[in-house]
Amino acid sequence: MSGLALEFCNVSKFFRDKTEQEIAILRNTNLQIHTGEIIALIGASGVGKTTTLQIAGLLNKQDSGKVKICGKEASHLDTTLRRKEIGFIYQFHHLLSELNVLKNVMLPLLISGTPKTIAEKRAKELLEFLKLEKVAYQPVDTLSGGQKQRVAVARAVIKKPALIIADEPTGNLDPNTAKDVFDLVCSFAKENGSAVFLATHDPSFLQKASRVLEIVNHSLISSI
């Protein structure tokens, strides 16, 4: 992969409060994230970090401006583009309890049309790398919090996406486990040339970021 994984061109996003007053989250915001970059997003609670990541991940539509993924303009919430090019990791893993570990990891490939035998082979390789092969056929509810989040990382990266969106991915973990999970995300991103757009409150993660951006006055500005 090379070039731009994500681009905002004059992106604005508003919402209405209880009094129907229009409140800006982003206003005429420009952003470029290159493949291989790890971009940390910081800001006070409620300032719009999650909404910004949702717009980047084509889960929430901007009110004006353009969003491009790998140079392709997403004029709407493009499910095909999202499934192909974007992986998601959240604070709460959102694994499917009705599926075992292996099937959870396989799921993105199966949805995108990858043959089951190939999807299973890739998923097993990932679980072996993560030292989770012994729990591959266990229900996800039997895993520890750290194990669940590593499975969530595997599910996010198995497609080798151009862009990984991570919204407080370690916020529910102890510091040592959080570091392990974050290191895994960085390792996979480096190996695959993926960009990472990460919202975090953890100052230790900022040291590994290519850039740190902060939402200030409805715009993304460089910080630290």
Curated annotation (Swiss-Prot):
Record keyword tRNA processing present: no
Membrane topology designation: Peripheral membrane protein
Keyword Chaperone: no
Record-linked Gene3D superfamilies: P-loop containing nucleotide triphosphate hydrolases
Binding site for ATP: G43, A44, S45, G46, V47, G48, K49, T50
Record-annotated ABC transporter domain positions: 6-224
Subunit text: The complex is composed of two ATP-binding proteins (LolD) and two transmembrane proteins (LolC and LolE).
Protein name (database record): Lipoprotein-releasing system ATP-binding protein LolD
Source organism: Neorickettsia sennetsu (strain ATCC VR-367 / Miyayama) (Ehrlichia sennetsu)
Taxonomic lineage of the native organism: Bacteria, Pseudomonadati, Pseudomonadota, Alphaproteobacteria, Rickettsiales
